Amino acid sequence: MTVSLNTMMGVDGLEDQEQLREIRNCLLKCISECSERGLVYAVRWAAEMLNGMNPIEMEHIPFSSTPTGEFDLDPDMANEKLLEVEEKNIYLLAKSYFDCKEFERAAYTLQNCKSSKSIFLRLYSKYLAGEKKSEEENETLLNTNLTLSSTNREFYYISEVLESLHYQGNKDPYLLYLSGVVYRKRKQDSKAIDFLKSCVLKAPFFWSAWLELSLSIDSLETLTTVVSQLPSTHIMTKIFYVYASHELHQVNSSAYEKLAEAEIIFPNSRYLKTQRALLTYDSRDFDEAESLFENILTNDPYRLDDMDTYSNVLFVLENKSKLGFLAQVASSIDKFRPETCSIIGNYYSLLSEHEKAVTYFKRALQLNRNYLSAWTLMGHEYVELKNTHAAIESYRLAVDVNRKDYRAWYGLGQTYEVLDMHFYALYYFQRATALRPYDQRMWQALGNCYEKIDRPQEAIKSYKRALLGSQTNSSILVRLGNLYEELQDLNSAASMYKQCIKTEETEISPETIKARIWLARWELGKKNYREAELYLSEVLNGDLELEEAKALLRELRSRMEHSYD
């Protein structure tokens, strides 16, 4: 076990070498414990963070994995250590089976062991064996009968053992983690959150527990509540908030602030550098995101983690040469990683070779059918191929994997809109706006949907919400003007059209032309001839000369002549 989250300091007083020593020792302890339990991804994360600390700061810190506090005086821990010593030989045998992926054999070997470490490895082996079997039973992709949350047959046994242990007062953090995993898989998120919070309070640098906690959180409100129940100054609480904000696609200034604080302790952390790139991507600053990802890849040339997101950035920027190079690099590193297949799929999509793109996204899902982005991207490709049925199926499966992914909900809305099923589309756009409340695109799509079903008041509210993201979207302002005109609210319509004209930068756009012609008619109706003439002259002085504007100008001049008679 490790020093608790409550006893660890945050980022205040970073000059204090004792704090850095404590963080370093906890990371070393976590690496040791997770390695013994076969939690390889947690080991990798902790090792990367350890190497992300400033070497200058570490020179004065002695190599030690002994935890701080009165760990050795805990009588329960002393008894636990005694059991581990007694079971060491059989544990090493079981761990060797586990490392060879003989999970059932490992579990069987440990069936009579009593230490928490042995019980964890036995139950974790059972869990992985059950996951493997459920995968084998559902190998066919895009089968309408496929349920991605197919039940792991070992869940009942694992739950029964864990509940008995918790009833007996066993608070081993790794067993708490396993309980959280099982409850999350069974879609009992509130219970999962409770167990995972207890786990991270006891083992704060155990990253796998934080990942599971993030997967159990489906909204920014829930995230805020969970974080408020954890020590706010602890560095792991801050890192978790950054990661969970990205997973929820809810990036705010608080996430950037917490990331900056973490970077003070881990200035060389590649993980944190990647988190900054991901936050920048979520903020839709694609040029900056590209620069950050390029720097990451330069310093870590064999990295594949999150490089699929880098390929998304290059796709949006339509940078075919860089995306093609990235696909070649990824393929040379490991052609059987889901990230590699996704990168290649994005490359073919950018070349408009959508059938090839689908092939690679399917390949990614054959390697990991819970690989969320591939389901969503495959849905996009099916839309391009006009295969709406397959697109809907892909998006639905994406939602099954992760209900907080706004892209899948948005994709469903767009697909049903193509099918002119606007009430269905409305529901999915509403889900997308709930997950992405500050994204102009979501509200614009919702407003358009309300227009299609003849609900102008709701459309106006949606478009106005979209404008909170940017007051300079001329197409939204024109739509608002049209809606107000339909409702006979001409003053509000005029206000929208005037705002539209203010968005104009250099050249006159089709939207501002329409706005000027409408305003000219409006001023003409009020006999404000000079103002009407001014709007029309601005249209005619532009690059586009419209017959409608010319005709209106002739009418205006005729009226002006009669008014002087």
From Swiss-Prot:
GO cellular component, one term: anaphase-promoting complex
Entry-linked InterPro entries: APC8, TPR-like_helical_dom_sf, TPR_rpt
Domain of life: Eukaryota
Gene3D superfamilies in UniProt: Tetratricopeptide repeat domain
Cysteines joined through disulfide linkages: none
A GO BP annotation: positive regulation of mitotic sister chromatid separation
Any matching Pfam family: TPR_8
TPR repeats: 87-120, 173-206, 270-303, 338-371, 373-405, 407-439, 440-473, 475-507
Keywords noted in UniProt: Cell cycle, Cell division, Mitosis, Repeat, TPR repeat, Ubl conjugation pathway
Stretch forming the signal peptide: none
Its job: Component of the anaphase-promoting complex/cyclosome (APC/C), a cell cycle-regulated E3 ubiquitin-protein ligase complex that controls progression through mitosis and the G1 phase of the cell cycle. The APC/C is thought to confer substrate specificity and, in the presence of ubiquitin-conjugating E2 enzymes, it catalyzes the formation of protein-ubiquitin conjugates that are subsequently degraded by the 26S proteasome. Has a role in promoting metaphase to anaphase transition via the ubiquitination of specific mitotic substrates.
Subunit structure as annotated in this protein's UniProt entry: The APC/C is composed of at least 13 subunits: apc1, apc2, nuc2, apc4, apc5, cut9, apc8, apc10, apc11, hcn1, apc13, apc14 and apc15.
Protein name: Anaphase-promoting complex subunit 8
Annotated source species: Schizosaccharomyces pombe (strain 972 / ATCC 24843)
Gene of this entry: cut23
